[in-house]
């Protein structure tokens, strides 16, 4: 939640998108993106979610999508505990693989940008040496 308060909606390194409720662009609206994600997952078994620690066992309909990538990967909160501490699951496009991050969304983004959190299905050139944020990188 601090992530949205600090940056708002937009994109890191023209790859990692951050969503928020009420975003003027429907593609960046957390409610709309979550609705679309849940519809896409409905009736599917996401086997890699079995790797999410037992404390966070969830079904896809419980996830809240707070971010995504240009490759259609999904960053979703696992809504367990206090909202500011919700962990994240990063789901590869096509629901092939998933990576769990026990930190908040802010900690997850920081880990991705400083290299302490590696996602094997993210491009090798992400992040840039000097990551940049843009509210509208394609304007």
Task: Describe these PLM feature segments.
Residues 7-10, 22, 72, 86, ...:
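Glycine-centered flexibility motif
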Residues 90-123:
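Compact, glycine/acidic-enriched structural inserts
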Residues 127-139:
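Charge-dense, low-complexity intrinsically disordered regions
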Residues 25, 72-75, 95-102:
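Short, surface-exposed beta-strand/loop "edge" segments at domain boundaries and coil↔beta transitions
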Residues 1-71, 137-139:
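A surface-exposed partner-binding patch
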Residues 65, 75-85, 89-94:
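Low-complexity, glycine/alanine/valine/leucine- and proline-rich hydrophobic stretches
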């Amino acid at each position: 939640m601090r992530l949205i308060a600090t940056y708002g909606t937009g994109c890191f390194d023209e790859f990692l998108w951050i969503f928020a409720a009420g975003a003027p662009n429907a593609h960046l609206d957390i409610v709309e993106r979550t609705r679309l994600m849940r519809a896409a997952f409905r009736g599917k078994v996401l086997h890699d979610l079995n790797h999410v620690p037992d404390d966070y066992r969830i079904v896809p309909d419980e996830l809240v999508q707070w971010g995504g990538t240009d490759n259609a990967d999904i960053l979703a909160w696992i809504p367990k505990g206090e909202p500011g501490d919700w962990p994240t699951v990063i789901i590869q496009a096509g629901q092939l693989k998933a990576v769990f991050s026990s930190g908040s969304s802010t900690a997850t983004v920081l880990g991705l940008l400083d290299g302490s959190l590696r996602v094997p299905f993210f491009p090798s050139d992400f992040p840039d040496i000097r990551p940049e944020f843009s509210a509208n990188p394609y304007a």
